[in-house]
Regions:
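Double-stranded beta-helix
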Residues: 13-91
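Catalytic core of Fe(II)/2-oxoglutarate
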Residues: 17, 68-141
Length: 141
């Protein structure tokens, strides 16, 4: 997922992010804690229209990684991270699945989301899909 963000704060306030560790490091740390994928549960979610399509194992793991990072307060305090202020009027581009990030402050933002096919990416081996597939030892989609 490639996202383009623009801070349009009319009062000139920055939008402040914390950007964390490389995705492979995050995946290796949290993957052992995640619940296993259940195809029947994915089918039930789709049948009940909780999800728009059948959730893949990759989607399942990415959602859990996100939740695990947010709920682990020790990780949030101790993980390597950088504060990134984006001034009002600035635009930035981010592979949001690959970049551990959290918004710390700011409001009034525009966002455009682009979905890139994994096989069309410049370095397919660096994608979150490839990294999680390597770490689990299996295909996830």
């Amino acid at each position: 997922i490639l996202r383009v963000f623009t801070n349009v704060n009319p009062e000139g306030a920055a939008r402040v992010w914390r950007v964390g560790e490389p995705f492979e490091q995050v995946g290796a740390q949290f993957l052992p804690r995640l619940k296993p994928y259940s195809r029947w549960q994915a089918r039930a979610l789709k049948t009940l229209h909780v999800t728009k399509s059948l959730r893949s194992e990759y989607d399942h793991l990415m959602l859990q990684l996100h939740d695990a990072m947010k709920s682990d307060l020790d990780y949030q305090e101790q993980a390597g991270q950088v504060t990134m202020p984006f001034p009002s009027g600035s635009t930035w581009v981010c592979f949001s699945d690959q970049t551990s990030h959290a918004v710390m402050s700011g409001q009034y933002m525009l966002e455009q989301t682009l979905h890139l096919s994994p096989d069309r990416q410049y370095d397919t081996g660096a994608s979150p899909l490839a990294i999680l597939s390597r770490l689990t030892g299996r295909s996830l989609v």
